[in-house]
Swiss-Prot record:
Region listing for Disordered, in residue ranges: 285-344, 390-419
Pfam assignment, any one: Pkinase
EC number(s) given by UniProt: 2.7.11.22
Enzyme class: transferase
GO molecular function, one term: metal ion binding
SMART domains: S_TKc (SM00220)
Name of this protein: MAPK/MAK/MRK overlapping kinase
Keywords recorded for this protein, A-Z: ATP-binding, Cell projection, Cytoplasm, Kinase, Magnesium, Metal-binding, Nucleotide-binding, Nucleus, Phosphoprotein, Serine/threonine-protein kinase, Transferase
Entry similarity comment: Belongs to the protein kinase superfamily. CMGC Ser/Thr protein kinase family. CDC2/CDKX subfamily.
Length: 419
C-alpha cells in the first residue's frame, strides 16, 4: 500500500473496512476495501469469489470497477482498490423529507436492472442486493460488494442466512438454502420501493417477523407454493391465511407501470418472479429504452463502440507501476434457469493462477459476452496463462533500491468462438 495515502474512513462491515485513498502515482482518489481476514497464500486469494467475480464482470457501466488488488504475503493483508463513488442509495435517501422524482427513480432502477442482467448472464448472482451495496456517482448507479456472490451453476443448497433480512426473499427464509438468482430480483424490488417511498417495504425484526411482514402486504401464498418450499426444508411450517393489504395501499405517488413492475419483482413464487432481462423490457422503462436507443445511434454515427460506458476517464484507467515506469491502459436467464447448450457450463467461477507476492492490476479486456446469451455455443470464458514481470529490471534512478516483489498481470478473460 506504499503507493497510496489514506485520506479517511468511509465505512466498516463485518469482514472489511473501506477507506478513501489517494494514489501517489496519479493523484486520483479510490476506495480501498481492506479485508480483516489474514491470508496465508495466493491460493486463498484465488478462492475469493469477490475478486473472481469482479474480474469477470468488469468493465461494465453499472458494476463497480476494480482498479487493483494488493496482497502482502508477509503480513497476509489483502486490499481491493476500487473506483470511488459519491454515496450509496441508503445515504441518498436517508433523512430526505420528500421522495425522489419518478424520473430519477426510473433512471436508477433501470441501471440496477442492467447490472443484475449483466451478472446473471455471466453466471453470477449477488445474494446481498441492498441500498448500502448500490453506489451512486452523479447520475450513474453501480452495484458493488460481491463478497456474498455465487455461481448460478454451483450446487444447492447454499448458505441459509445470506442477504440482509429486510431484503431476503421468501425462498431464502423458508427453505434450507434452495434458492436461485431470482432472489436478487426480490431484493431489488424491496430497494425499488424504498427509493420511491423512503421507507423499507418489509422491516422485519427477526426471521418469523420478516415472513409475517411479507404476508401482511402480499398475503399468504397459494398452498402449492408453500408445499414446494416445504419439500426443501426439514422443519414443517404453516401460516394463517392473510389476504394482504397490497403495495398500492402503502403508496400514493407511484404510477401504475411502476407498481406493475414492483409487483412482478416481489412475486412470492420465484418461478413466477420477473427476471432482470424481462424487467428491462417492462413498459415502465419505455422512456429509458428510447433514450438508450438514441444514444446508441449517436455512438454508431460517431464511430464509437455499440456498448456505451459511463464517462469516467480517470477512474476507468489503470496505472501499472514497474519501478519508475507508468503504463496507462484503458479499462474497458430466461424465466427459469438458462438451458445448457453444448459443453457443460462451469460449476464455479474460474480461479486466477498467481505466484509470489503480487500487486494485481486490472487492464483492458474486451467487453464480456454473456455466457448465457445466444451465439456462445455453450462455451464459457477461459483464462490465458499469466505473464509474470520480473522485478529485477529497474530504471537507473532505482538501482540502489531493494529488489521489489514479483508482480503479475491478471489475464484477460476471453471467449473461444466469441466475437
Amino acid at each position: 500500500m506504499k503507493n497510496y495515502k489514506a485520506i479517511g474512513k468511509i465505512g466498516e462491515g463485518t469482514f472489511s473496512e473501506v477507506m478513501k485513498m489517494q494514489s501517489l502515482r496519479d493523484g486520483n482518489y479510490y476506495a480501498c476495501k481492506q479485508m480483516k481476514q489474514r491470508f496465508e497464500s495466493i491460493e486463498q486469494v484465488n478462492n475469493l469469489r469477490e475478486i473472481q467475480a469482479l474480474r469477470r464482470l468488469n468493465p461494465h457501466p453499472n458494476i463497480l470497477m476494480l482498479h487493483e488488488v494488493v496482497f502482502d504475503r508477509k503480513s497476509g493483508s489483502l486490499a481491493l482498490i476500487c473506483e470511488l463513488m459519491d454515496m450509496n442509495i441508503y445515504e441518498l435517501i436517508r433523512g430526505r423529507r420528500y421522495p425522489l422524482s419518478e424520473k430519477k427513480i426510473m433512471h436508477y432502477m433501470y441501471q440496477l436492472c442492467k447490472s443484475l442482467d449483466h451478472i446473471h448472464r455471466n453466471g453470477i448472482f449477488h445474494r446481498d442486493v441492498k441500498p448500502e451495496n448500490i453506489l451512486i456517482k452523479q447520475d450513474v448507479l453501480k452495484l458493488g460488494d460481491f463478497g456474498s456472490c455465487r455461481s448460478v451453476y454451483s450446487k444447492q443448497p447454499y448458505t441459509e442466512y445470506i442477504s440482509t433480512r429486510w431484503y431476503r426473499a421468501p425462498e431464502c427464509l423458508l427453505t434450507d438454502g434452495f434458492y436461485t438468482y431470482k432472489m436478487d430480483l426480490w431484493s431489488a424490488g424491496c430497494v425499488f420501493y424504498e427509493i420511491a417511498s423512503l421507507q423499507p417495504l418489509f422491516p422485519g425484526v427477526n426471521e418469523l417477523d420478516q415472513i409475517s411482514k411479507i404476508h401482511d402486504v402480499i398475503g399468504t401464498p397459494a398452498q402449492k407454493i408453500l408445499t414446494k418450499f416445504k419439500q426443501s426444508r426439514a422443519m414443517n411450517f404453516d401460516f394463517p391465511f392473510k389476504k394482504g393489504s397490497g403495495i398500492p395501499l402503502l403508496t400514493t405517488n407511484l404510477s401504475p407501470q411502476c407498481l406493475s413492475l414492483l409487483h412482478a419483482m416481489v412475486a412470492y413464487d420465484p418461478d413466477e418472479r420477473i427476471a432482470a432481462h424481462q424487467a428491462l423490457q417492462h413498459p415502465y422503462f419505455q422512456e429509458q429504452r428510447k433514450t438508450e436507443k438514441r444514444a446508441l445511434g449517436s455512438h454508431r454515427k460517431a464511430g464509437f463502440p455499440e456498448h456505451p460506458v459511463a464517462p469516467e476517464p480517470l477512474s476507468n484507467s489503470c496505472q501499472i507501476s514497474k519501478e519508475g515506469r507508468k503504463q496507462k491502459q484503458s479499462l474497458k436467464q430466461e424465466e427459469d434457469r438458462p438451458k445448457r447448450r453444448g459443453p457443460a457450463y462451469v460449476m464455479e467461477l474460474p480461479k486466477l493462477k498467481l505466484s509470489g507476492v503480487v500487486r494485481l492490476s486490472s487492464y483492458s479486456s474486451p467487453t464480456l459476452q454473456s455466457v448465457l446469451g445466444s451465439g456462445t455455443n455453450g462455451r464459457v470464458p477461459v483464462l490465458r496463462p499469466l505473464k509474470c514481470i520480473p522485478a529485477s529490471k529497474k530504471t537507473d534512478p532505482q538501482k540502489d533500491l531493494k529488489p521489489a516483489p514479483q508482480q503479475c498481470r491478471l489475464p484477460t478473460i476471453v471467449r473461444k468462438g466469441g466475437r
